[in-house]
Amino acid sequence: MMQVWKRSRNIGVWVAAIAIAGGLAVCAVLPASAEEAGNMVFYRGGFTRLSSDRSGETFANGSTGQKNDSNIGWYAGAGLDFLLSKDTWGAMDKTWAVGELGVQFNRFASNSVRGAGVSGSTTDVKTQLTMVTIDVSPKIKFREGQALRPWIIPVGLDIHVISPPSNQTQYLDIGLQFGAGAEYQVWKAFKVGLDARFHLAAGMTNTTNNYFTVGPYVGVSF
């Protein structure tokens, strides 16, 4: 358990360093060097935390009292931003409406347990607690023409797949996500950013699938 917390602390240090670098960029905000096309492909990764662990479930735990009782881990994902409007359909100047299509893999802290689920194994094997999230979300991106651009996701749609399945062998869930972040134009089409998101799931698997993420991303506009 201590090793898990140490790894999470190290991730937090990296995230803090990126946030500091972003703060320095704020002090020297420069106009963007060229007109942005509006579309972007991006890659994300960082720290994730479930609202509740899965230690009370048959498929996650072992037959000898061992438990997968941690709710922290990491995530990696990618997505596409598609420009919808450069003035939010006339509502706000220099404020873009962007549509995000993303996919994300979450791997929560996993332990070696004996005979998890229905395997009947007599040896300890690692049971991976994972979740895949596919999202379609609107982004409101502010400060057109500037190198540093904050943005928000007012509310987005999530589809979740959990593994292992719940006690009722269900694995599909639906939910909402809320997020905020900022990105900095490093050079031409290349950008770096930092975001934080909360995913609120419906619980259709009879498990609590809500989780939080924070981490950096890199993007290329096109």
Please state what every model-predicted region is.
Residues 36-37, 50-58, 64-66, 94, ...:
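Predominantly the C-terminal beta-signal and adjacent terminal strand-loop region
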Residues 67-69, 147-149, 162-165, 186-193:
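Substrate-binding/catalytic groove segments of enzymes
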Residues 1-38:
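Cleavable N-terminal export/targeting peptides
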Residues 57-66, 114-122:
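Solvent-exposed loop segments that connect transmembrane elements
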Residues 134-136, 154-159, 172-182, 196-198:
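Hydrophobic alpha-helical segments of small multi-pass membrane proteins
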Residues 47-49, 74-166, 214-215, 219-222:
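Gram-negative (and chloroplast) outer-membrane scaffold detector with strong preference
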